[in-house]
């Protein structure tokens, strides 16, 4: 009699365990490919005597394709006419631009912990006096880390419309932080 009761208890415990596993598996969201957004911060050097800072929100879609909504600040320094080298005034006050834009990043190759995207987009902004538009093209390589973090590097080329520069090209490195 005791054997039958313990057998029934084990049967119900096994049933409860299986039910709990099924509920857990269906109710808890997965994190492998969740298409959540990332905050992206990157900085780099551009030819000729330029520095770039980009802060962006990246929304990843299927197969590592992504949309990027970004704000960009560019600083171009020059040598000081009076002292002959780069001083704080010639560094910070020479030529500055800012812009807001959108870029589409189709994935061209994927690996185990990395993926590569083309970066195609446009932006609109201003320097100190005029409206400045730009067309962006480039290549981005991202490496996945733990907890959804990524590090990346970009080779970027910008065609400037209405600014002092016509072309800007350079390398940017940065980090992508997951937004939950």
Identify what each model region corresponds to:
Residues 1-36, 179-180:
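Cleavable N-terminal export/targeting peptides
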Residues 6-9, 13, 19-20, 56, ...:
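Short amphipathic alpha-helical "recognition" segments used for binding
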Residues 30-77, 170, 176-180:
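Short glycine/proline- and aromatic-enriched beta-strand/turn motifs that initiate or cap beta-hairpins
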Residues 41-54, 92-96, 123-135, 159-168:
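Solvent-exposed loop/turn segments connecting transmembrane beta-strands
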Residues 58-151, 177-180:
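Gram-negative (and chloroplast) outer-membrane scaffold detector with strong preference
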Residues 154-155:
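Internal, hydrophobic beta-strand segments that form the core of beta-sheet-rich folds
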């Amino acid at each position: 009699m005791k054997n039958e009761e313990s057998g029934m208890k084990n049967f119900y415990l096994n049933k409860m365990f299986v039910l709990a596993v099924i509920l857990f598996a269906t109710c808890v969201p997965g994190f492998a490919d969740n298409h959540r957004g990332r905050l992206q911060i990157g900085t780099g050097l551009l030819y000729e005597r330029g520095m770039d800072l980009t802060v962006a929100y990246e929304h990843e879609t299927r197969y590592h394709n992504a949309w990027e909504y970004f704000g960009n600040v560019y600083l171009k320094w020059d040598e000081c006419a009076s002292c002959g080298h780069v001083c704080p005034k010639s560094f910070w006050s020479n030529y500055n631009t800012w812009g807001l834009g959108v870029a589409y990043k189709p994935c061209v190759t994927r690996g185990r912990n990395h993926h590569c995207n083309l970066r195609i987009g446009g932006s609109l902004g201003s320097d100190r006096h005029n409206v400045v538009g730009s067309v962006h093209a480039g290549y981005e390589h991202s490496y996945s880390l733990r907890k959804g973090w990524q590090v990346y590097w970009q080779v970027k080329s910008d065609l400037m419309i209405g600014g002092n520069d016509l072309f800007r090209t350079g390398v940017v490195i940065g980090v992508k932080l997951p937004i939950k």
